Amino acid sequence: MAVGKNKRISKGKKGGKKKASDPFAKKDWYDIKAPTMFTVRNVGKTLVTRTQGTKIASEALKGRVFEVSLADLQKNEDDAFRKMRLRVEDVQGRNCLTNFWGMDFTTDKLRSLVRKWQTLIEAHVDVKTTDGYTLRVFCISFTKKRQGQIKRTCYAQSAQIRQIRKKMMEIITREATSCDLKELVAKFIPESIGKDIEKSCQGIYPLQNTFIRKVKVLKAPKFDITKLMEVHGDYSEEVGAKIERPAAAAPAVEEAATA
C-alpha cells in the first residue's frame, strides 16, 4: 500500500472566514465650499479615509479637483454648458475650501456651435493675473451673415481671420492682466469678454457665438491663507466671534470668583 497524502481529503483552512468589514466605516464626509463669486456655496460632499497614524485626512483632501456645472453654482439653467473646476486649497473643520482651477465647455454645446457655411476662428493666449496666477485662455468664435446678405455662405478671408485672432488675444490679455483671479472669474460667468470681442471685430467681419471656451491654470502662486479667506469671505468672521453675556449673569460670575 502506497504511503502518502490523500489529496482528495481537503483540510479546513486555518482561522476560518474573515469578517467582511464595511469600507465606509473608516471614512468621513466633508463639505465642499465654493468661493464667494458663485451664488451657491455648498457644492456637495466628498469622502476621505479617517486620520490614521501618519496618514492625515486633511492632507489627502488638499489638491482634490471637483468639476461642477455652472448651472448648479449660479442657479441658472442657461449656464449648464459650462463646467467649472474647483480645487481644494485648505480644510477647516469639516469644510473643504476650494478655489477656481479651470473652466471648460460640455462636448454637446461645442458640437452644436460648429455648422456649415461659416468660418470657425480660434485663439489661445497665456496671461498672468495681478495675484500671480498664470492661465491659458482659449477663445472660439464664428462668422455670421452681414445685414441683408442673400449669399448663403459667410466665409472670412485669411487676412480677416488673422486680424480677428489678433484682436481676440489683445482683448483677453488686457482683461486678464488688469485684475486678480476672483475678478477674472466674475468676467467669465456672464461672458463679458466674448461680447467685447464681437463688438470690436464688427468692422472686420460680423461674429456670433463668441465664447471663452476653456481656461487652464498653468501656474499658481504660493499658498496664502489670507488670500483664500478673502475668496471665502464669511469664514474669517466666524472664528473667534464675541459672545454677549446677559447683564444679570455677569455679577453672579464675579461673586462666585470672589468667594
Curated annotation (Swiss-Prot):
It holds the Pfam family Ribosomal_S3Ae. Its main location: cytoplasm. PROSITE patterns: RIBOSOMAL_S3AE. GO terms for molecular function: structural constituent of ribosome. GO terms for cellular component: cytosolic small ribosomal subunit. Residues 1-18 have a biased composition (Basic residues). Transmembrane segments: none annotated. The keyword Zinc does not apply. It is found in: Cytoplasm. GO terms for biological process: translation. Keywords: Cytoplasm, Ribonucleoprotein, Ribosomal protein. Residues 1-22 are annotated as: Disordered. Belongs to the eukaryotic ribosomal protein eS1 family. Component of the small ribosomal subunit. Mature ribosomes consist of a small (40S) and a large (60S) subunit. The 40S subunit contains about 33 different proteins and 1 molecule of RNA (18S). The 60S subunit contains about 49 different proteins and 3 molecules of RNA (25S, 5.8S and 5S). This is Small ribosomal subunit protein eS1. It comes from Chlamydomonas reinhardtii.
